[in-house]
Amino acid sequence: GIPYWTYNNGDEPLVAISLLDTSNIANQLDSTPRVFYLGGNPEVEFPETQEEQQERHQQKHSLPVGRRGGQHQQEEESEEQKDGNSVLSGFSSEFLAQTFNTEEDTAKRLRSPRDKRNQIVRVEGGLRIINPEGQQEEEEEEEEEKQRSEQGRNGLEETICSLKIRENIAQPARADLYNPRAGSISTANSLTLPILRYLRLSAEYVRLYRNGIYAPHWNINANSLLYVIRGEGRVRIVNSQGNAVFDNKVRKGQLVVVPQNFVVAEQAGEEEGLEYLVFKTNDRAAVSHVQQVFRATPADVLANAFGLRQRQVTELKLSGNRGPLVHPQSQSQSN
């Protein structure tokens, strides 16, 4: 669930051996190893298990689509999925351009169509990166983790009988993230509602105004259940192979299951907004937003990974300053 990149700055070839612990407590999927690439056009790393997933996906999409979008939507989806194997290749260029407030050419490069370099990219001239002092940051993180682990063992923790059991996360003043044109997001977890620690659950309330977008993101440590409580919109979910496993309109009363680490994006309809609740199977569910990942990634890494010019990298990193809630029309007007 944590995005990372590696770079060999030495004079000799580097051979790295990765151990994937699928029985880890943080893994809430199954024992099938999956690698989610944000960029490039990677080769399949686990062909035995990935082929089974691909067969199931093809069987699913070979069925009649019916009222969920029709043959035209199915053909468009299959065309998009032929371009690459990264998770961003499962989104259309138009949608990525709206989400990241970039030009169409930049959005196409983010989808990595027909990129022959696969997972490994050769950097001409080396990377120019400013390295922060990491030791102090690591020590601070260790101290914070120690303090968190000691919480609940100081004799002052709440008992189950005295725990607060209700929280209204739909209140506008309660919003954790807010965009006056796009919408708001509120969360409740064991830090704000301690009883959730015993249930191992957390919740998220999302309100999107008309055409508002909750940009592509994924849950690092939880599966989630999305329940629409008002309005209508569209939900798109992409798996580790870059396939859009779900791309449909949703309306009041409908449920959508989003597996851990699968990238998901939501957009409200043109006629009315979209309000929904997300129930997550972790009392401290963590979310990664693609925009924020790009913002934190060194410019040279983005330029080489996606084949972008410096100007394109700059506009891509600036999109991370706007947050995960986006309104396409207001972004185009700001340009």
Curated annotation (Swiss-Prot):
Give a yes or no for keyword Zinc in this entry. Answer: no
SUPFAM superfamilies (UniProt xref) = RmlC-like cupins
Q: Where is the composition biased (Acidic residues)?
A: 135-144
| Compositional bias ranges of the Basic and acidic residues kind | 105-118
Domain Cupin type-1 intervals:
167-314
For molecular function, the Gene Ontology terms on record are:
nutrient reservoir activity
A Pfam family recorded for this sequence: Cupin_1
Q: Which keywords has UniProt assigned to this entry?
A: Disulfide bond, Seed storage protein, Storage protein
Against Gene3D superfamilies, the record matches this protein to:
Jelly Rolls (2.60.120.10)
Using the UniProt annotation, give all residue ranges assigned to the region (Disordered).
47-87, 102-155
Q: Which domain of life is it from?
A: Eukaryota
Q: Does the keyword Membrane apply?
A: no
- Supply the SMART domains for this chain: Cupin_1
- Any idea what job this protein has? This protein found in the seeds of many leguminous and non-leguminous plants is the source of sulfur-containing amino acids in seed meals.
Spell out the subunit comment.
Answer: Hexamer; each subunit is composed of an acidic and a basic chain derived from a single precursor and linked by a disulfide bond.
The family line of this record is: Belongs to the 11S seed storage protein (globulins) family.
- Please identify the protein, giving its name as recorded: Legumin type B
In its UniProt entry, the species of origin is given as Vicia faba (Broad bean)
Gene label: LEB2
